[in-house]
Amino acid sequence: MKRALLVIAFLGTYAATAQDYKGHYGIGLALGEPSGFSIKKFNNNSEAFQYTLGYSTVDGKEGINIGVDFLLHNYDFITAEKGKIPFYYGAGIHLKSYNNAGNQIYARVPLGLAYELSDLPLDIFFEFAPGIAVVPEPSLVTNFAIGGRFYFDLNKARRAVEERI
């Protein structure tokens, strides 16, 4: 527990560079359907996993949405003078657990644009994700979000903490 707290304390010191997110984590907020926390972990400069924990309201039902998406990024789709604007797309699976109204499991195809700032380890994104529910019955699902994430190098922070212990 002590080690985990120290890692968190040093995260701000070890922010990722805006030009290379490989191996870095982004933590932020998303507003939309669902609204909540967004975590993105880049495996390399084009592949990432996106994790969602949010609050969902659809058709008068409220509940928690938990999901994971695998994303591919295309940095050549749109160019910018400063920063980068990747188009990303992928596939994912989400679970909605409604208060007193059952659960919904659905597959989705996230499509989005992100603006990665050139001077800060921050991105701002817009995402649209159509999907198909398989539980409790087949139906169409639509997710959308606008949000932002701060990126940091967790491995660099962990090494720094271990050196101090």
Question: Regions from the language model: what does each represent?
Answer:
Residues 29, 33, 37-41, 68-74, ...:
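Residues on the lipid-exposed face of transmembrane beta-strands in outer-membrane beta-barrel proteins
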Residues 36, 54-60, 75-77, 93-100, ...:
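Sequence/structural signature of outer-membrane beta-barrel proteins
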